[in-house]
Amino acid sequence: MDAIKKKMQAMKIEKENALDKSEQLENKLKEIEDVKVKIEEDLTSLQKKYTNQENEYDKVNEQFNESTVKLEASEKRVTECEDEIKGFTRRIQLLEDELERTQQKAEEAVLKLEEASKAADESERGRKVLESRSIADDDRIDKLEKDVKDSKYLAEEADRKYDEAARKLAITEVDLERAETRLEAAESKITELSEELQVVGNNCKALQNAVDQASQREDSYEETIRDLTQRLKDAENRAAEAERVVNKLQKEVDRLEDELLQEKEKYKQISDELDQTFAELAGM
C-alpha cells in the first residue's frame, strides 16, 4: 500500500512537472511567434518604403525628361525666329536696293527730258533766226523744217518719255509706299519677334533653371536612392538573417511542439495509469 502511495505521489509530482514544462513551452512558443510576426512586419515596412522611393525616382526622372523636351522645343523656336528675322532683313535690303534703282532711273528720265526740251528750244530759236533773215534757200528751209520736225518729234518723244517716266515714277511711288508699308509691317514683325524671342529666351532661362534644379534634385534623389539601396541591402541582409532565425526558431518550435506532444502523451499515459491505479484501489 505504501508503495502504491509513493508511486501515486511520484506520478502526481511528475504530472505537475509535465504541466509546468508544457506551460513554459507554450509561453516560449508564443514569444517566438511574436518575434516572428514583428520581423515579418519590419520586412513588409522596408519593402513598402523601397517601393515608394522607386516611384518617387521614376516621377523625378519623368519630370526631367519633360523639361528636356520643352527646352529642345524652345531652342528650335528660337532658331526659327532668328531665321525669320534674317529673311525679313534680306527682303528689306532688296526693297531698298530696288527703290534706289527706281529713283536713279527717274532722275535719268528727267535729265533726258530737260536735254530734249533744250534741243527743241534751240531748234525753235534757229528757225526764228532763219525766218527773220528771210533766207530763200528752200533746201535750207526744208532742212530747217525737217530739223524743226525732228525737234518737235524729239520734243514729243521727250514728252512721251516724260509721261512714261512720270507714270513709272507714280508706279514707283506706289511701290515705294507699298514697300514702306511692308517695311513697317516687317519692322513691326521684327519687334514682335524680338519680344517673342525675349520671352522665349526668358522661358529658356527658366527651363534651364528648372533643369538645373531638377538635376540637383535628381542628384539628391540618387544619393537618397543609393542610401535607400544600401539600407535595403542591409534590410535584406537583416531579413535574410531574420528568416534564418525564423527558420531556426521554427525548427525549435517544431522540436518544442514535438516535445510538448510527447509530454502530453506522457501526461495522458500517467493519467491513464492513475485512473487504472484508482480503479485497482477501488476494486480492493
UniProtKB/Swiss-Prot annotation:
InterPro entries registered for this protein in UniProt:
Tropomyosin
Q: Which Pfam families match?
A: Tropomyosin
Segments forming a coiled coil: 1-280
Matching Gene3D superfamilies: 1.20.5.170, 1.20.5.340
Q: Which SUPFAM superfamilies match?
A: Tropomyosin (SSF57997)
Recite the UniProt keywords alphabetically.
Allergen, Coiled coil, Muscle protein, Repeat
Give GO MF terms, alphabetically. protein homodimerization activity
Asked if the record carries the keyword Coiled coil, the reply is yes
Task: Tell me a GO biological process for this protein.
Answer: regulation of muscle contraction
Query: Does the keyword field hold Coiled coil?
Result: yes
Top-rank taxon, per record: Eukaryota
| Biological function | Tropomyosin, in association with the troponin complex, plays a central role in the calcium dependent regulation of muscle contraction.
Protein family according to the UniProt entry: Belongs to the tropomyosin family.
Instruction: Please give the record's comment on domains.
Output: The molecule is in a coiled coil structure that is formed by 2 polypeptide chains. The sequence exhibits a prominent seven-residues periodicity.
Assembly, in brief, is: Homodimer.
Q: Which PANTHER family match?
A: TROPOMYOSIN
Q: What is the protein's name according to its record?
A: Tropomyosin
Q: Which organism is it from?
A: Sinonovacula constricta (Razor clam)
